[in-house]
């Protein structure tokens, strides 16, 4: 019987564990439909957390789980790490040298594989084997999470530009209105409606 964590518990778990880092964004967790490898069913789940006090000057942190148990060793030999490295994260707002390898930035990537028989690389059960079916499913789950992250980053960029535009308008327009009013010998008009129209709000 497969035992996925589920979207709600993934988000709650990440929020609880990472509370001290105060991330600004939790991408909607992804739970893929069951697939099979070597006759054994498996499910891939993924989540991404971004911003806040997560360090931005180093590689992203990777949280790997198999049947709800954290995988703490042999990260480089694991299918989860390899799938993360193969995705072009530059398209989704993270830095990545040459479009391959572990991305850099203020993010934490979590991947969980639930299976009746997880294909580990060794008896130590520290890394998941890089089988094509598993790599493909991890990649698809990560892309969905990464798209959500990119949407958030685009939204934040638009907010930033709107705020900068508002600051410029607030600074320049009153000065222009005052000079024009002086030249025409009229009182300075109320600019609230004009600023609202310019800002499209």
What are these regions (language model features)?
Residues 1-52:
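Glycine/threonine-rich ATP-lid/beta-loop region of ATP-binding domains
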Residues 1-16, 154-167, 196:
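A glycine-rich phosphate-binding loop feature that marks nucleotide/adenosyl-phosphate handling sites
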Residues 26-29, 185, 189-201:
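N-terminal, positively charged regions that mediate nucleic acid binding
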Residues 51-194:
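Charged regulatory segments coupled to nucleotide-binding catalytic modules in large multidomain enzymes
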């Amino acid at each position: 019987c497969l035992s996925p964590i589920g979207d709600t518990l993934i988000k709650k778990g990440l929020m609880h564990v990472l509370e001290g880092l105060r991330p600004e964004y939790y991408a909607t967790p992804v739970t893929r439909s069951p697939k099979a490898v070597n006759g054994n069913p498996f499910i891939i789940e993924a989540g991404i957390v971004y911003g806040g006090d997560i360090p931005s000057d180093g590689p992203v942190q990777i949280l790997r789980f198999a049947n709800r148990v954290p995988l703490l060793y042999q990260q480089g030999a694991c299918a989860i790490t390899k799938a993360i490295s193969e995705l072009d994260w530059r398209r989704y707002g993270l830095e990545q040298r040459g479009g391959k390898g572990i991305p850099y930035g203020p993010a934490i990537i979590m991947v969980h594989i639930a299976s009746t028989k997880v294909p580990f690389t060794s008896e130590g059960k520290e890394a998941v084997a890089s089988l094509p079916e598993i790599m493909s499913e991890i990649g698809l789950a990560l892309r969905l999470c990464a798209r959500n992250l990119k949407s958030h980053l685009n939204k934040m960029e638009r907010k930033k530009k709107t705020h900068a535009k508002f600051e410029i308008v607030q600074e320049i327009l009153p000065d222009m209105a005052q000079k024009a009013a002086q030249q025409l010998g009229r009182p300075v008009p109320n600019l609230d409606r004009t600023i609202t129209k310019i800002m499209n709000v």
